[in-house]
């Protein structure tokens, strides 16, 4: 009987709800180990439901935020303490295809740019014309390729007067008889975020056309739950343009873009889209002296949009947007005297300042490089969400 006890140990079954509760308290590295033990646990850990609950539970005042920096050589580096730095090659985006005996087409003018981040997933593009964009999880190294559709522009336009006079754009109707290949365009801007009502993820594609008298844009939404691409608006923004040096920022169910005054090229307002209603709205910038786009830094802090002038003054002020439907207002949440802080002390609170603190010394000394850092670096919270699991 003693031998039977040793040779036939009892099997212990852990209920799913108890296992999930345990997993919520484990670090990412431990979760990765549990994934290889059970397909059921893999599905649980990679699910958006699990990640949503885990993000809520870890909604601490100092979240475990990391930065992903894409170098010119198509290598991704995690900006952390140097002793713990992690570097991996995004082979999917590698420019050197010699191992596969493929020739590189110099005419493609390959580039890599960060387009946005939400729930630990990062959206990238690798061509100037957006022919391919990728959704990656820097933590698990998984990725999914997305292929935006061409947008066709009408030859004749008819203008509709907006119902609300305070809208600085005109929504357009379109009359189309025929198309020519020259009017087929790929998107010029994109953003990635989550519909917080339906808990589904969406990519917003912006197609711009700037003419002498009018500046128009069309918007498409790519729903990752079903792969559907649909038009959500055709607008004339008239007196302003999108800021090319700023990428979109996701926060609390909306995507935000900075716009500039067309003639002066100075900061104008924020253009936002609610990812549930898929409607655009304008948001005034906070009352500060910021005028130039290169000075403005935007990021997501605890699901609220934050904004700061990172170059103009030694007194760095951080503004946070409160979205209390139907009103939105800015609140000053930090004021930091930069000239009395040594840059090597900023790493402890870099998450407060977004990209500006991660590259603080570089940005202060080389202002012409700000847009380069901004378009190749993004913050994210590590999760185990699998990009391929977003498609049903």
Curated annotation (Swiss-Prot):
InterPro entries: F-box-assoc_dom_typ1, F-box-assoc_interact_dom, F-box-like_dom_sf, F-box_dom, SCF_F-box_component. Pfam families: F-box, FBA_1. PROSITE patterns: FBOX. Residues 8-55 form the F-box domain. It comes from the Eukaryota. NCBIfam families: F_box_assoc_1. This is Putative F-box protein At1g71320. It comes from Arabidopsis thaliana (Mouse-ear cress).
């Amino acid at each position: 009987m003693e031998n039977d006890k040793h040779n036939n140990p009892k099997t212990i079954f852990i209920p799913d709800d108890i296992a999930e509760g345990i997993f919520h308290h484990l670090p990412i590295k431990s979760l990765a180990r549990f994934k290889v033990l059970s397909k059921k646990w893999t599905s649980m850990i990679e699910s958006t439901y699990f990640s949503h609950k885990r993000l809520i539970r870890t909604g601490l005042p100092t979240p475990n935020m990391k930065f992903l920096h894409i170098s010119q050589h198509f290598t991704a580096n995690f900006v952390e303490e140097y002793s713990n730095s992690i570097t991996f090659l995004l082979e999917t985006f590698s420019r050197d295809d010699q191992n596969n005996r493929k020739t590189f087409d110099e005419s493609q003018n390959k580039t890599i740019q960060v387009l946005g981040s939400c729930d630990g997933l990062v959206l990238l593009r690798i061509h100037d014309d957006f022919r391919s964009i990728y959704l990656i999880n820097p933590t698990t190294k998984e990725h999914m390729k997305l292929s935006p559709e061409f947008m066709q522009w009408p030859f004749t336009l008819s203008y509709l007067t907006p119902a609300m006079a305070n809208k600085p754009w005109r929504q357009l109707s379109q009359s189309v008889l025929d198309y020519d290949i020259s009017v087929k365009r790929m998107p010029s801007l994109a953003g990635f975020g989550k519909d917080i009502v339906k808990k589904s993820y969406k990519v917003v594609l912006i197609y711009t056309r700037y003419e002498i008298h009018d500046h128009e844009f069309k918007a498409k939404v790519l729903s990752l739950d079903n792969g559907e691409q649909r038009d959500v608006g055709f607008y004339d923004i008239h007196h302003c343009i999108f800021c090319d040096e700023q990428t979109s920022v996701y926060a609390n169910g909306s995507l935000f873009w900075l716009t500039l005054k067309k003639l002066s090229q100075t900061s104008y307002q924020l253009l936002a889209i609610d990812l549930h209603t898929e409607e655009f709205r304008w948001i005034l910038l906070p009352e500060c002296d910021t005028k130039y786009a290169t000075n403005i830094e935007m990021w997501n802090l605890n699901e609220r949009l934050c904004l700061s002038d990172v170059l103009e003054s030694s007194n760095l002020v951080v503004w946070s947007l409160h979205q209390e439907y139907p009103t939105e207002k800015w609140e000053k949440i930090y004021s930091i005297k930069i000239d009395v802080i040594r840059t090597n002390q900023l790493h402890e609170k870099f998450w407060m300042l977004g990209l500006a603190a991660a590259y603080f010394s570089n940005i202060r000394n080389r202002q012409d490089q700000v847009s380069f850092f901004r378009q190749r670096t993004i913050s994210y919270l590590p999760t185990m969400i699998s990009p391929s699991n977003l498609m049903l």
